[in-house]
Amino acid sequence: TPANFLFTQWKRLPSLISHKREEDGITEEELVTMVDQAENEGGLDEHESELIRNAIEFHDLEVSEILTPRVDLVAAEEDSTMEEVASLFAESGYSRIPIYHETIDNIVGVVHEKDFYAARYRGETMLKNIKSPVFYTTGNTKISELMRILQRNKAHMAVVVDEYGGTEGIATLEDIVEELVGDIWDEHDEVIEEF
């Protein structure tokens, strides 16, 4: 059946994309065509075919295509008071906030909401004492590579730097996963009702 053939090819996808061996002879475009054909013939439903298409395109996407730009960042200055940071967490709904030194172009760490409130409860008053290291990347890094780096380092966020070393934005593990599986709703996302 078309679905069986497609899933056989699906299992071979990583080697097809990264090694393009002569004997295989299947391009990404041909694989997408097979997915479309399987969907049209009823072998795949719309969601399955979308997931497969996203997986095929996943290796081509760059961090610059998924980042949150610097103008939309919620970040705290390293010398911010605990009350100011608590307000940022409450107003933004984010679980991690980048910490910068003097300017947003100098992000020096990230603080997790859970760690922040635990430290605040213990009486900690210095934000720089509870920040975690942050990872840096460039906009032309493939998101599949950034995902491996974040997973290897058990991190959820990377600062995307521009060609001058300034902050272009941030990319999160959630941003990467959403490119593969679609939007992930959480309790802080705005609900939009369609009529």
Regions found by a protein language model. Name each.
Residues H19-F195:
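Soluble cytosolic regulatory domains appended to membrane proteins
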Residues T1-P14:
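Hydrophobic alpha-helical segments of integral membrane proteins
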